[in-house]
Amino acid sequence: MSSSDDEVLVWGPGFGSECGEQTSGLEAGSTAPRGPGPDPGPEPGAPQSGEGEGGDGFPDPEGFESEREVLEAGGPVLLGCEGRPGSPADDTGYVVQLSDESVAAILRQLADLDLLGIRRHMSPESHGVGDVSPLRDVEARPGSRGAAAQRCGEAARAEAGPRWVGRPRAGRAWGNPKRSTNVAVDRQWPPSVSPARLFSDSESSDECSEIQPMRVSIYPKDGGQAKLNSPKDPRDTPRHSNVQGRETLPNVPGTCLSSAPRGLISVVERQGKQGDAEQETISPPKKIQSVLWGKGGSLPSFPGVAAAAATAAAATGRLPRPSPRRKRVQEKKSLGGVSKPALGRTFPSWGRGISATPLDPATFPPISGIPLLGRSQKYASVPWGAKESKHTGAGKKSVARRARELVAATAVSGEDNDPNRDPVPKGQLATDRPWPSCPRVHHGEPSTANLSIRGGQDSGNSKPVAMNKGEVMPRGPGPSGDQKPADHHPRLKRRQQPPRRQGCPRCLVLQKEIDDLKEQLASMQYLAEKFRIL
């Protein structure tokens, strides 16, 4: 056969009634070998092997009309049914006439199998339908070479020959005949070549030799594993899982792959993941529950009971669910257990006196400065005179009474024995010193506290002070037992500032005590602010 010859090999069931099995036709050009008879050559209106084709690469009915005329005039004989060399058939020529209906049926069947990739529900009796090799595998183009086309045809015949009706390979790939299966007859194409443009350039014979014509994939409906039938080693094909079976078809286009393996893969993967998750998550929930219960149980103030409950929950694997009322009780206990030691640790007591009972933040009044001094009786750092600051009007009366008694005592025991001078200095000493010496102290209760301090401290040193004050400010005559002038002297002293007050030694001591009180007040305010934050 010359290089310009083109041939078309067609396989399919029911190609003729004379042979009783699959037949094939050979179409040749003007130089193709023919049987006995005249060789009229190509007709003017007859299309060549590449002419008259549609977009799909298949000849149209008009082209086949002309080809039928060529065959009737002495065209090629059928493969497999022609006479062997030396037989009488070679001499007489065996011509088969194909009707237009049979050619159209063949073309429709081949187009359905090759282009659309229809999946068929096949029974063991109709397995030959899936083994039909498409026409496009060996279809020739106008510029193709005869040798390349012949190689393609031989490869197609060699691979399609073993697969025959009634002889399914190895039986394993077809599964149980009684079981309904899905058979996908898919074509494996190279990854870089699409099926539509595979044979656009048929000059290279490597493409034809590398192409495997067919792969039959059967996916059982009952959820079994997919079995692949390879044309090379059908009996040695191992059983693959759905995922591996999918990986063994890397070159099949997405349109050719059936949806059955994807569904099976998704279902099996989902079931496998669920099974693994069930196996792996049998123990973690128990552990998580025990950990959560341990954390929740560590909040109450009884760690032993919480630890026992946590170990019991971990051993049994059941998470006890406390009622809302029990949760509230536990929260209250946890708040109480945390706040009591925290106060003792965070704010240690100062001074010598330590209270045994913990401080309650709710009992602290808002900061006003002076009311906080009322709690200073529990601490030794606060002077003893400040204890009287929390008393009401009765405390003030007692302070005034002490001042009057001190004035009377100094008047009786004075060196001068002059009752006219003594009451006035004593009243001035007891009542007037806090006003100039404490300019920033409130004029309420602190003044009474300082009065009591002055009265207690001046009782031993009343004689020299009384003498000095007596010499500076003499007063008019008055009865020694009369104590009324002591009540009016603070008002008079506010108007008349006595001289030499800046050089008094007692002012330094009083100022020092005032500074100490201010420091204590600041510390108390700081602590009260912290308690309020907590």
Swiss-Prot record:
Region (Disordered): 1-93, 123-260, 313-349, 383-505
Ranges of biased composition (kind: Low complexity): 145-161
Start-end of Basic and acidic residues biased regions: 230-239
Disulfide bonds listed in the record: none
Pfam families xref list: DUF4641
Keyword field: Phosphoprotein
Modified residues (Phosphoserine): S87, S123
Pro residues bias spans: 35-45
PANTHER family membership: GENE 4779-RELATED
Protein name: Uncharacterized protein CXorf49 homolog
